[in-house]
Regions:
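Short, hydrophobic transmembrane alpha-helix segments
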Residues: 16-30, 250-253
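Membrane-interface helix-loop-helix junctions at boundaries between adjacent transmembrane segments
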Residues: 53-56, 60-62, 72-129, 136-137, ...
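Long hydrophobic alpha-helical segments that form multi-pass transmembrane helix bundles
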Residues: 113-173
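N-terminal membrane topogenic signal
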Residues: 1-11, 63
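Hydrophobic core segments of alpha-helical transmembrane domains in multi-pass membrane proteins
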Residues: 30-40, 86-99, 183-187, 198-210, ...
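Hydrophobic, membrane-inserted alpha-helices
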Residues: 11-18, 69-79, 98-101, 164-168, ...
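Predominantly late transmembrane helices and immediately cytosolic-facing juxtamembrane segments
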Residues: 193, 202-219, 227-232
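C-terminal ends of transmembrane helices
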Residues: 44-54, 98-110, 166-176, 211-220, ...
Length: 301
């Protein structure tokens, strides 16, 4: 069992106690903003390192120019979508999120498409199906629509729980015990907690932390301590930049930061997913899960 899964299972299970006294929307937004700042956004700070490992042998020292241009172009395309076709952009964002979460969290190379969709749809579908009234205002704001239009659509999407449940059954047959435990506490969190808080927990503790540790192993697969230092050093500038932006949003009110945060995440999801799908597949393979020593037991175990 990896350290990351132990942390995820314990943290999310403990957080479910918040259901005894549900936090206010402001408190949920503060957790989301803090989590995205400290873990969520920084986990994409490694994209240029992954790109360098693949593109430098082809393009030499000038590899960064086409990478940066492509990254900004993809992010800009999504941002333009929020302006011109917000409803279509929201649907695209949700679809990409399912694929990205599923591929990153379900070890899709081992369990196949059922595992990818089962795990990837979990945070999206459970939010919509179990808490449509709470999700509708956020989706309406993102899509530049009205709650009265969005809410019936979300309620009508509840039927998707049935095919998703069948995929979960298929996936659990190939999953490890701790993968099933993580999925169970994640489902419990989305059932018991407000959807914004449940998503913040999933995105930061499950998805982003797993990605950070995997890329830490890419930096130094032989020395766990050096890998941790590399993670902090690489993610530090992005974390500071996010902290400045988060402070600016918080000054205006943490509740007003919810929609901008999701729009920025959507804009960065497309280029980040391109890196994780295309470039990581061509980079030197690294151990999944956490930094570890190849010649001795991991100090993170």
């Amino acid at each position: 069992m990896s350290l990351q899964r132990r942390v995820a299972v314990g943290t999310v299970a403990l957080a479910c106690l918040a259901a005894l006294r549900p936090p206010s929307l402001s408190a949920q937004a503060a957790v989301l903003l803090a989590g995205v700042t400290l873990v969520g956004m920084p986990h994409g700070a490694f994209d240029h390192l992954v790109a360098a490992r693949v593109l430098r042998p082809w393009l030499g020292t000038g590899w960064w120019a086409p990478f940066l241009a492509g990254y900004v172009a993809l992010a800009g395309l999504v941002w333009i979508g929020w302006i011109l076709v917000p409803a279509l952009t929201l649907m695209g964002f949700l679809t990409l999120s399912v694929l990205h979460f599923g591929l990153g969290d379900a070890d899709g190379d081992r369990v196949g498409i059922a595992g990818v969709i089962a795990r990837g749809a979990m945070p999206i579908l459970l939010s919509v199906a179990l808490h449509p009234a709470a999700v509708a205002p956020v989706f309406a704001a993102l899509a530049s629509s009205h709650v009265a239009v969005v809410l019936p659509m979300l309620i009508g999407a509840r039927w998707l729980i049935l095919p998703w449940g069948l995929l979960i059954v298929v996936w659990t047959g190939a999953a490890t015990a701790w993968e099933r435990a993580e999925a169970a506490v994640t489902c419990a969190a989305f059932a018991l907690l407000p959807p914004l808080l449940a998503f913040a927990l999933y995105f930061c503790v499950c998805h982003s932390l797993r990605h950070l540790l995997r890329l830490g192993a890419m930096l130094d697969p032989y020395d766990a301590r050096a890998a941790w230092f590399g993670v902090l050093r690489t993610a530090g500038p992005a974390t500071l930049l996010c902290a400045v932006c988060a402070t600016g949003l918080a000054v205006q009110g943490v509740e007003t930061a919810i929609v901008p945060v999701f729009r920025v995440l959507a804009a960065l999801t497309l280029p980040h997913m391109a890196v994780t799908l295309w470039l990581e597949d061509r980079a030197e393979p690294v151990p999944k899960g956490r930094p570890q020593l190849r010649t001795a037991p991991s100090r993170l175990a």
